[in-house]
């Protein structure tokens, strides 16, 4: 009896703690004097309800028909408590389908948490836009650009395409933006007027939207700043982040003028703090759905979303319902080194990647800035999404009839695996596509995308189908620490029905999971074709006891596969926290795709080299000093570095055995220049004093050996390029793997001289 009483007390205590946590989360909300309601009777019914119940009718919410926003005549502007009695009176009205009091939402701008084409344009910062042009000194260096120039050379520059940036405003009178500014694609939802001009303050906090817009549409050849990816497109700004953000404001922004705007670019989302789980509210979700169904005269709005900057916080973008949406194209970042940056998040919903900032030694992104200024320090996935939006604008100029799903297929089929190949995590799915949780299907390639979109050859993808798979007899399954729940899901993918699916696009696993510590859960889904995808990785900072309620975990990793067969879901907790417990309450698998294979997928994807030299660190070994005679078989240089064949080298480019020969002069100068905090030199490097090059090669390779030992890393999967493993912090304050290598070289130089 005593044991049972003690057990009941413990259970009561756990429930009390959960109740406190839930109410604590709610207590942080700030409710505003606005109510959203769905009223099928139209404006007349909405006006009548407002008059009868003491509201002012503020108007329709964005493009959502029969959805209206009300303001109560006798309620404070803000309150920590919801006005439940007012909401109930409104929702109980027979003319109202649904009603909700609006509350403030925390939204974070996704900038980083730290803060031969050279003569093509006369814009002063054009030669710093390394991601748009091939700025290599020699062919041995990695090719970095997004293949935009070949598209421009076809005369495709974004003409006739309208992009709007959902952010903190747009300095539309900026010299490098004004010629391309479109007031019909602009609005200020913070102040409810048609001018999205940002609010100035001493810290220039509201520069984000102007920078994002500049990346897309900076004017070319006007002697100002740089050049936008789609420099003849039209750009607008939606000011919605510089004030209270509610579901109604988000819906109005996402659904603004969808008959005129082609592409919406958003570089924000819920907090990237490693513990938030949040997605679009009811209204924003409906705005997404309306956009893809009605936007662009029925072809569908293109929504481009930055994948998030919570990498350092251990965040996972599968907990962000905006990037996790089937309606958005989620874009991640790659650094100038071709690596996953320190801020990037991993998730199964990321579709593709463009460039952005990396470590402090890497160059960043150039754009327009507040006060008619320019910047070369735009950072984070915030900078990646607008570059993608600009590339999509080029595709829409080439083929205005592309649907929103056509665009996603084009991205999947043309993104490049090769330039990012030396990062861990790549896998080939059952349709032969290379995919990675860090990068999606790879680096965007503007030329390949626009070429495939050619209206003379492109065939629009078949009609979208949706097949829901669930077990009506499923009983809740318990899960505890160090435990595992395995669910086998056999499916015929609605075979024989109108919604049968033979070629997959998105896959959603919708589940309600109750758990005492949400961040300890790990969810993996294996497709019928054998592709294993992490839908949720552990998040150390997420201590919430709230679990997941009808949450959609979305994956693109099985794109193109035939779904027929048995899928396997694994939900585990390997944290070792013995007090953890919970249960899987319900689930369903939602398959999105087509009943027939899209035309462009009837032949397998063929991956070709993105660059003539493999795009990794080993490229520098073949680099030749431009000022020196190149070695030939007849006249070999004594200092040429020769490595063993791949069969005698260890994994990850480590050299266990190397033939004698000192490192090349060019290699050392490249490494030394890269270690500088300044931007890399734009001219050919001058010859260094010969004394600086007299380095015992044994020491050099010893340094390489120590710095590349996988055994020092905690996670074997990430042993090659996990740049931020905590174990390294104990010895050196350098956060980037290359920094440690370069510092070792500098130490050798100092010792020898």
UniProtKB/Swiss-Prot annotation:
Basic and acidic residues bias (residue ranges): 615-625
Residues in the signal sequence: 1-27
Reaction equation(s) it catalyzes: Release of protein hormones, neuropeptides and renin from their precursors, generally by hydrolysis of -Lys-Arg-|- bonds
GO biological process: cell-cell signaling; insulin processing; peptide biosynthetic process; peptide hormone processing; proteolysis
Residues cleaved off as propeptide: 28-110
Protein localization: Cytoplasmic vesicle, Secretory vesicle
Protein name: Neuroendocrine convertase 1
């Amino acid at each position: 009896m005593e044991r049972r009483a003690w057990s009941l007390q413990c259970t009561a205590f756990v429930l009390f703690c959960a109740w406190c946590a839930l109410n604590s989360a709610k207590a942080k909300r700030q409710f505003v004097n606005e109510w959203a309601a769905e009223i099928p009777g139209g404006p007349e019914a909405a006006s009548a309800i407002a008059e009868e119940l003491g509201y002012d009718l503020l108007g329709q919410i964005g493009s959502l028909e029969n959805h209206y926003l009300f303001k109560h005549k006798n309620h404070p502007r803000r309150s920590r408590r919801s006005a439940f009695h007012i909401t109930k009176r409104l929702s109980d009205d027979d003319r109202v389908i649904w009603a909700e009091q609006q509350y403030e939402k925390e939204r974070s701008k996704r900038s980083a948490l730290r803060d031969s084409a050279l003569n093509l344009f006369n814009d002063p910062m054009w030669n710093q836009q390394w991601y748009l042009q091939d700025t290599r000194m020699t062919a041995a260096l990695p090719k970095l650009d997004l293949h935009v120039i070949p598209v421009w050379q076809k005369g495709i520059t974004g003409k006739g395409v309208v992009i709007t940036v959902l952010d903190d405003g747009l300095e539309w009178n900026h010299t490098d933006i004004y010629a391309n500014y479109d007031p019909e694609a602009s609005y200020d939802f913070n102040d409810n007027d048609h001018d999205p001009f940002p609010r100035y303050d001493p810290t220039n906090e509201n520069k984000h939207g102007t920078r994002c817009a500049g990346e897309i549409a900076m004017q070319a050849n006007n002697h100002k700043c740089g050049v936008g990816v789609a420099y003849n497109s039209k750009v607008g700004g939606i000011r919605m982040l510089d004030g209270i953000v509610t579901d109604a404001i988000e819906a109005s922004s996402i659904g603004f003028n969808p008959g005129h705007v082609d592409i919406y670019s958003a570089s924000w989302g819920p907090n990237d703090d490693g513990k938030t789980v949040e997605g679009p509210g009811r209204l924003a979700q409906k705005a997404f759905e309306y956009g893809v169904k009605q936007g662009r005269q029925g072809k569908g709005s293109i929504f481009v979303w930055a994948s998030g900057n919570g990498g350092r916080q251990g965040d996972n973008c599968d907990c962000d319902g905006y990037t996790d949406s089937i309606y958005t194209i989620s874009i991640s970042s790659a650094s100038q080194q071709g690596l996953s940056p320190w801020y990037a998040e991993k998730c199964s919903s990321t579709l593709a990647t463009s460039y952005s900032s990396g470590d402090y030694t890497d160059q960043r992104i150039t754009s327009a800035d507040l006060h008619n200024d320019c910047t070369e320090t735009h950072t984070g996935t915030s900078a990646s999404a607008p570059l993608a939006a600009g590339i999509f604008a080029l595709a829409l100029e080439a083929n205005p009839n592309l649907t929103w799903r056509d665009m996603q297929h084009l991205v999947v089929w043309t993104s490049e695996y090769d330039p990012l190949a030396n990062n861990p995590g790549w896998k080939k799915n059952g349709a032969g596509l290379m995919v990675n949780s860090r990068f999606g299907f790879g680096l965007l390639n503007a030329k390949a995308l626009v070429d495939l979109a050619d209206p003379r050859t492109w065939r629009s993808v078949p009609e979208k189908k949706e097949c829901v798979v669930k077990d009506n007899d499923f009983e809740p399954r318990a899960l505890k620490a160090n435990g595992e729940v395995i669910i086998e899901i056999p499916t015929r993918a609605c075979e024989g029905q109108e919604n049968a699916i033979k070629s997959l696009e998105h896959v959603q696993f919708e589940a309600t999971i109750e758990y005492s510590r949400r961040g300890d859960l790990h969810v993996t889904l294996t497709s019928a074709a054998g592709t294993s995808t992490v839908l949720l990785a552990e998040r150390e900072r997420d201590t919430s006891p709230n679990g997941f309620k009808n949450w959609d975990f979305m994956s693109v990793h099985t794109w193109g596969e035939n779904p027929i067969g048995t899928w396997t879901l694994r939900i585990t907790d390997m944290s070792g926290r013995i007090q953890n417990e919970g249960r899987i309450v319900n689930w369903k698998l939602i398959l999105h795709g087509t009943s027939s294979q899209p035309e462009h997928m009837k032949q397998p994807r063929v991956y070709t080299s993105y660059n003539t030299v493999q795009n990794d660190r080993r490229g520098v070994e073949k680099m030749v000093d431009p000022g020196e005679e190149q070695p030939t078989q007849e006249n070999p240089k004594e200092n040429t570095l020769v490595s063993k064949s791949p069969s005698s080298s260890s994994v990850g480019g480590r050299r266990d055995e190397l033939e004698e020969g000192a490192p090349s002069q060019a290699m050392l100068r490249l490494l030394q220049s890269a270690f500088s905090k300044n931007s890399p030199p734009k001219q050919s490097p001058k010859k260094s004093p010969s004394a600086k090059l007299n380095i015992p090669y044994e020491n050099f390779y010893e340094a390489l050996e120590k710095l590349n030992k996988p055994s020092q890393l905690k996670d074997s999967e990430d042993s090659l390029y996990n740049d931020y493993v905590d174990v390294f912090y104990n010895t050196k304050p350098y956060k980037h793997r290359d920094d440690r290598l370069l510092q070792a070289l500098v130490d050798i130089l100092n010792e020898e001289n």
